[in-house]
Amino acid sequence: MLLAADVGNTNVVFALFEGRDIRARWRIATDPRRTGDEYAVWLLQLLQIEGVQREEITQIIFASVVPRANHNLTVLCEKYFGIAPLVAGEGKAAWPFQADVDQPSSLGADRALNILAAHEKYGGDLIVVDFGTATKLEAIDFNGTYKGGIIAPGINLSLDALVGKTAKLPRIAIRAPETASVIGRNTEDQMLIGVFWAHVAMMEGLIERMRAEIGRPAKVVATGGLAILFDEKTDIFDHVDADLTIEGLAILAEHASKQ
């Protein structure tokens, strides 16, 4: 079995794969100070609950946008599983696609995994939208070449700025507004409308501009924790794939095994 870990700015997602099928997944808050031993205490208990012996894991791969976490994950893999992990974007796990951009080496691992998985799963010209700490949009041509993208503040970052820079506005929970009205009747509704519909308008507008620049029809694949929430209020997505990033790790591990 393959153990994959995606280290994001907010959470670390672990997934256990049998082939390309996800058998189990677990999530823990990202903390660069968390040691390999602490990861092991948490993860080995979850594997036991799942009925998996650590010896059944034969390959480990991780991707990280938090460099300070990498050493501790490597300790986890080597000390508790006896496996040298593949690191996404490095060595045998180098990205197996072309990046037609100015600085290919600056492409974040999470974005690269989305590019790889989207092309593998859906093909054709694509725009991938990932709703994370930042909202990221990627343009991929029919050959799987990465053509560039956009990084914008995520909806929670927008809300944090709104609340943090004002004296009286309250903290609210992000959710889909109950009605299509964009005229709120109280402060909390007005804030929700402001951050939610502004994000939808930004996303839809950017996608249409990207499609026009690409010059060919491009399917839109949405991923990230809030993708389903936005899918309720827009029809611009062709596919919503919550597992796109983590599945990218399984695909990358397959490529690495052939090296």
UniProtKB/Swiss-Prot annotation:
Pathway assigned in UniProt: Cofactor biosynthesis; coenzyme A biosynthesis; CoA from (R)-pantothenate: step 1/5
Pfam families attached to this UniProt entry: Pan_kinase
Location of the protein in the cell: Cytoplasm
Catalytic site positions: 110
Gene Ontology MF terms: ATP binding; metal ion binding; pantothenate kinase activity
Binding-site list for ATP: 6-13, 133
Catalytic activity line of the entry: (R)-pantothenate + ATP = (R)-4'-phosphopantothenate + ADP + H(+)
Residues reported in the UniProt entry to bind substrate: 108-111, 187
Chain's role: Catalyzes the phosphorylation of pantothenate (Pan), the first step in CoA biosynthesis.
Summary of subunit composition and partner proteins: Homodimer.
This protein's name: Type III pantothenate kinase
